[in-house]
Amino acid sequence: MGVELKFSDAQQKQENQIKAIRSLIAQKVDVIGVAPIVETGWVAVFQEAKDAGIPIIVVDRRAAVPPDFYVTLMGSDFVEEGRNAARIMAKWTDGRASIVELQGTNGSAPANDRYLGFREILKDSPGMKVIASEDGELTVAKGKEVMARFLKTHGKNITALYAHNDDMALGAIRAIEEYGLK
């Protein structure tokens, strides 16, 4: 069959992703798959791939480009994920919570959409308030760092945590344990 997979680790930087896509275009690959770090800033490089006749498959995260610039998007409904998180939290807290939020990468489709979905449900839950929200960079280390800061500022007033992914949640749990809470 002769399939060769080429991979580039962009280190969570859009400029590195754009360089990698341009390199793949120059190599005349058959198809490009990309999980955009952020939603915006993709039109030029996607146009370059389109002009070269190389289809792009967008994975996990949307890119703010015309729909004919890529062949498909394989991903989740992040707005619904945010809604579901808020519904579950409302159930477990009887609709009363002082929430801290660890968001995903600023400007990314998952972070933007989970934020919107979560807050959509909170509008109908007056006893649930987000008291602090910050980018946790989707990592254990940053999740722990931000949660430690939340705890220093808000302490035991925090009654719930909404983390946009499991790595940040794991970091937050470590910070919570070090703070002496369970």
Residue ranges and their predicted role:
Residues 1-182:
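A residue-level marker of the well-folded mature domains of exported/periplasmic proteins
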